């Protein structure tokens, strides 16, 4: 789950 959240944030940034 953590890696998925990081991916989402990275996409926004």
Curated annotation (Swiss-Prot):
Leucine amide sites (modified residues): 13
Recorded coiled-coil stretches: none
Keyword Secreted belongs to the record: yes
Chief localisation class: secreted
Role according to the record: Antibacterial activity against the Gram-negative bacterium E.coli and the Gram-positive bacterium S.aureus.
Stated family: Belongs to the frog skin active peptide (FSAP) family. Temporin subfamily.
Record protein name field: Temporin-1Ja
Protein source organism: Rana japonica (Japanese reddish frog)
